[in-house]
């Protein structure tokens, strides 16, 4: 069995693994147990009841956090002409057409967090699937990253829109802020993210969509949240 550090063991002792905490108590506890030397990210983990073998039950979309994630988001845009200028003016970090495709192909360049593309660029960037796909960076209409309105998309991702998708086990992991955020901002981000995911429930899912809700910091332990508290707020 893996041996955990003394710090991890001390954190674990503060969390009752059998208890389901209220939203406010979970946020307070995650802040108390975040003792790393950097500003840890607060992460919301949602265990869903989707059948990951069925394509129509995959969850892939975006959620917008009212207070952002606390992280500087690096946005790359594949566009030409006026669209490229609009992306630059909106604050995109990297903008280009075929030359940007070649840079990624030749240099394996992935020093960005979000990739947006205009529809006319999709044929050119199709060959980047093997590089961008595994990193979750491939533009997709489902995630709002293939669009003519690159200006709005760039601003939205810069201000707090994030891509979400389920993993192979059906879990969805969402950063909802930093431990340095005050409790109210974390609360509003968490509730907003949860409600937006609930609205994305695939039609074919049977029974309860969200089976378990857990909150943690980057280096912390999982804190289970009472879903009835989430539903009643």
From Swiss-Prot:
One GO biological process term: translation
Entry's transmembrane regions: none
GO molecular function term, any single one: rRNA binding
Entry keyword set: Repressor, Ribonucleoprotein, Ribosomal protein, RNA-binding, rRNA-binding, Translation regulation, tRNA-binding
Protein name according to UniProt: Large ribosomal subunit protein uL1
Function description: Binds directly to 23S rRNA. The L1 stalk is quite mobile in the ribosome, and is involved in E site tRNA release. Protein L1 is also a translational repressor protein, it controls the translation of the L11 operon by binding to its mRNA.
PANTHER family tied to this protein: 54S RIBOSOMAL PROTEIN L1, MITOCHONDRIAL, LARGE RIBOSOMAL SUBUNIT PROTEIN UL1M
Family annotation (Pfam families): Ribosomal_L1
Signal sequence extent: none
Keyword Repressor found: yes
CDD domains from the UniProt entry: Ribosomal_L1
Species of provenance: Pseudothermotoga lettingae (strain ATCC BAA-301 / DSM 14385 / NBRC 107922 / TMO)
Stored Gene3D superfamilies: 3.30.190.20, 3.40.50.790
Similarity comment text for this entry: Belongs to the universal ribosomal protein uL1 family.
Subunit structure and binding partners: Part of the 50S ribosomal subunit.
Domain of life: Bacteria
């Amino acid at each position: 069995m893996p041996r955990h550090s003394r710090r991890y063991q001390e954190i674990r002792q503060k969390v009752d693994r059998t208890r389901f905490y209220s939203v406010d108590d979970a946020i307070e506890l995650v802040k108390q147990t975040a003792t790393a030397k950097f500003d840890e990210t607060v992460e919301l983990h949602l265990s869903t009841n989707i059948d990951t073998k069925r394509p129509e039950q995959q969850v892939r979309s975006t959620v917008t956090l009212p207070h952002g994630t606390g992280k500087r988001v690096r946005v790359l845009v594949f566009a030409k002409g006026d669209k490229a200028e609009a992306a630059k003016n909106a604050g995109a970090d990297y903008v280009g057409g075929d030359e940007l495709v070649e840079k990624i192909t030749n240099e394996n360049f992935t020093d960005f967090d979000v990739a947006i593309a205009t529809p006319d660029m999709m044929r050119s960037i199709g060959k980047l699937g093997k590089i961008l796909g595994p990193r979750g960076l491939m533009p997709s209409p489902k995630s709002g990253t293939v669009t003519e309105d690159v200006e709005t998309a760039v601003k939205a991702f810069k201000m707090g829109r994030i891509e979400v998708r389920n993993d192979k086990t059906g879990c969805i992991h969402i950063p909802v802020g930093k431990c340095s955020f005050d409790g109210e901002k974390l609360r509003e981000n968490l509730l907003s993210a949860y409600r937006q995911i609930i609205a994305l429930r695939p039609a074919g899912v049977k029974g309860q969509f969200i089976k378990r809700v857990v909150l943690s910091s980057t280096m912390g332990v999982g804190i289970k949240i009472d879903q009835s508290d989430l539903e009643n707020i």
